[in-house]
């Protein structure tokens, strides 16, 4: 699988990985594969937050579960498990994606950044600071995904309008805040990032 992954920016999702299938050895399972082939472990190499990880995963393992269960990076949350809420948003090769829509094998050879990779030592990323300063969270469950989406926005658009911020957050749901403080948090971070 190539690290040049085609990302559908409208949904923050990726196309489903389709392994090569030996047509003489199919019995009608997943993608026509035998049960043994369906669950055969696949070696992958993924750089997460600047650290290379070599692992062996089942082809059906979602990136979110690889990050959480295999690497212990539990800052990436599983909210809806249906690609609706955005709580699982990470950066894959510099793009914000919902990691519940990406198979771990699709990330083979890729660069992944999670919420744990944003801080610089003891110093929070400006977006993390903004959420603290402007009270952009309540229960906090959506916060990692919101922050990862906001960081992606500010890296590509350093001075977004309120409407651009709201549009960028369309794939992220929050049941607590009403979004006003989230938008204010991102505006605060935008100003801080432009001044530094």
Predicted regions and their residues:
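Acidic, Ala/Val/Gly-enriched low-complexity intrinsically disordered segments
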Residues: 1-8, 15, 20
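Signature of N-terminal electron-transfer/Fe-S-associated modules in redox systems
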Residues: 13, 17-196
């Amino acid at each position: 699988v190539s690290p040049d992954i085609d990302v559908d920016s409208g949904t923050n999702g990726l196309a489903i990985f389709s392994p090569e299938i030996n047509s003489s050895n199919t019995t009608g399972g997943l993608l026509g594969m035998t049960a043994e082939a369906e669950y055969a472990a696949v070696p992958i190499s993924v750089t997460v937050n600047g650290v290379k990880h070599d692992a062996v995963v089942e082809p059906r393992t979602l990136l979110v579960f690889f990050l959480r269960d295999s690497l212990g990076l539990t800052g990436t949350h599983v909210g809806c498990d249906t690609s609706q809420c955005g709580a699982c948003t990470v950066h894959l090769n510099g793009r914000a994606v919902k990691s519940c829509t990406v198979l771990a094998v699709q990330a083979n050879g890729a660069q992944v950044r999670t919420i744990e990779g944003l801080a610089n030592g003891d110093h929070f990323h400006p977006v993390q600071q903004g959420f603290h300063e402007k009270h952009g969270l309540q229960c906090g469950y959506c916060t990692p995904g919101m922050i990862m989406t906001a960081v992606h926005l500010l890296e590509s658009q350093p001075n977004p309008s309120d409407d651009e911020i709201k549009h960028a957050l369309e794939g992220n749901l929050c049941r607590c805040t009403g979004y006003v403080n989230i938008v204010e948090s991102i505006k605060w971070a935008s100003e801080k990032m432009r001044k530094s």
